[in-house]
Amino acid sequence: MDLTKIEHPRVVKTMSIPQLKQLSADIRRFLIEKLSKTGGHIGPNLGVVELTIALHREFDSPKDKLIWDVGHQSYVHKILTGRAAEFDTLRQYKGLSGFPKRSESEHDVWETGHSSTSLSAAMGMAIARDLKGTDEYIVPIIGDGALTGGMALEALNHIGHEKTDMIVILNDNEMSIAPNVGALHNILGRLRTAGKYQWVKDELELLLKRIPAVGGKLAATAERLKDSLKYLLVSGVFFEELGFTYLGPVDGHDFEDLLENLRYAKKVKGPVLVHVITKKGKGYSPAENDKVGTWHGTGPYKIETGTFVKTKEGGPSWSGLVSETVRRIARTDPRIVAITPAMPVGSKLEGFASEFPDRMFDVGIAEQHATTLAAGLATQGMKPFLAIYSTFLQRAYDQVVHDVCRQNLNVFFAIDRAGLVGADGETHQGVFDIAFLRHVPNLVLMMPKDENEGQHMVYTALRYDDGPIAMRFPRGNGLGVPLDEELKEIPIGTWEVLRDGSDAVILTFGTTISMALEAAEQLARDGVSVKVVNARFLKPMDEAMLHELLESRLPILTIEEAVLQGGFGSSVLEFAHDHGYHQAVIERMGIPDRFIEHGSVSELLDEIGLTAAHVADRIKTIMPRKQKRA
């Protein structure tokens, strides 16, 4: 079938089961082919092909609300809602988003990117439906990994208490990104093998009612003994105890089983949970046989061999450099413990986990718990290393402030994917952490210019005993600079001059250092001499150097691959104002006050005006404005 001809999901409503199976095969071939060129979340989407088709067959989108948790498994939904022709642009600049996008389609009723939000959103939609007196079905689809998130469990508790009408689809593939962990995962494992509880209960009730004279009384007695029956038939009965009608387990690749259970769910009053078992990566053997999460989300790959297309050469990956440096130090410091919220592969912690299995904790999608777990460890003299993406640290803000920084505990936050991340777009750009961290008392915040300085910062962080410390670092590979064999501490709060100059000053750090140096080279050819400072400590700043620079009366330009509001440039302005440099010329470049969508990092930087050429032009505009201090 030519999938680009699909304009509306109603097309699946008239298909026979054999036709639906053929459509599934066509979609899998399409995804494998398209994603081999663009990259994307291949594993999750290959696993939900039949489930997505069945949902669109039984429900009437967009009237009925299909809400995709996390959203990376929405590609099949996009195909069935008329967007197959755009898949060549998937996750590309100005192209199709890799997540549900309300501006893209009326069928995308909720935008996601972070996990565990679907149930709360669904409940809000269901309450609005009931208050307005409409009759649409509300259907959140949540994975077993996302169900480990505290927000999802909070919503389950509230939905069950309110007896809200909705149909929750639990897509259980035994993995989130990496293999799942935790007691809830073990409960689901028992449910997978327990048989269809709801069907057995209903059949028993019908059988008892057929017994002459006493059947009705026996059925009533059985209903009163429902709890005993549940515990006999199903190990755990977790969802029934929360107030849900539990259906399953259902074969997520069998249309008859799926459609039968979805039809039954539509008849049930109150919240229903349909437990669907799927195989992540189904239909493409490299993804289907993946046990660690390599094929969860990928770059381009070769279909025939299942090998990834190599990107341009560079240094070691930043995640790998940080984790391996921690591992190296941990060999001589038994206090070091690693923690990750469900990202052991992305954070390159496999080696640490293999060498120190009793000192490595993957807590699942539980950023708040991960942070306070680290705080608890620190109270007992341990040195917790929390590997967490910038975008996910947002979810643990109160714990950072209240549990770690307020108590001045020695926690090392390794903030991965800081800055623009590219193809994952606005839900994953790591551009807010400076603004939400720099004002928190007791916290040290730093970012290295290259991987050699990065390894020394890791060492500095793990040697630091005066409170919490955080190191930001970008996605991808380093610059390929030589690495010192011996690790050394960097004095806290010190900057360094990378290039001297007499006409203007650039203050920057991290990934924008190379941009500043390139701009300085361009300006030198025009006779403009620019000093470039590596402002590697964002907090505390190098106040002695900052005084010296302000006393020089040179115009200052700050550059950051982060939001301007409340960022590093703002801290420099505040310092100048607070210390009486009221005539200082200070301008800022960074991320504007809007969410940055998907595209390559270079394309996004060009769009927002953050390149070496833009920096050189900006320096030229502030040169005539040099003024003396008041």
Curated annotation (Swiss-Prot):
Mg(2+) binds at D144, N173. Keywords: Isoprene biosynthesis, Magnesium, Metal-binding, Thiamine biosynthesis, Thiamine pyrophosphate, Transferase. Pathway: Metabolic intermediate biosynthesis; 1-deoxy-D-xylulose 5-phosphate biosynthesis; 1-deoxy-D-xylulose 5-phosphate from D-glyceraldehyde 3-phosphate and pyruvate: step 1/1. It is an enzyme of class 2 (transferase). It comes from the Bacteria. Its EC number is 2.2.1.7. InterPro entries: Dxylulose-5-P_synthase, THDP-binding, Transketo_C/PFOR_II, Transketolase-like_Pyr-bd, Transketolase_BS, Transketolase_C, Transketolase_CS. Pfam families: DXP_synthase_N, Transket_pyr, Transketolase_C. Its cofactor is Mg(2+); thiamine diphosphate. It catalyses: D-glyceraldehyde 3-phosphate + pyruvate + H(+) = 1-deoxy-D-xylulose 5-phosphate + CO2. One of its GO terms (biological process) is isopentenyl diphosphate biosynthetic process, methylerythritol 4-phosphate pathway. Binds 1 Mg(2+) ion per subunit. Binds 1 thiamine pyrophosphate per subunit. One of its GO terms (molecular function) is 1-deoxy-D-xylulose-5-phosphate synthase activity. CDD domains: TPP_DXS, TPP_PYR_DXS_TK_like. GO terms for cellular component: cytosol. Signal peptide: none annotated. Thiamine diphosphate binds at H72, G113, H114, S115, G145, A146, N173, Y284, E367. Homodimer. Catalyzes the acyloin condensation reaction between C atoms 2 and 3 of pyruvate and glyceraldehyde 3-phosphate to yield 1-deoxy-D-xylulose-5-phosphate (DXP). Belongs to the transketolase family. DXPS subfamily. This is 1-deoxy-D-xylulose-5-phosphate synthase.
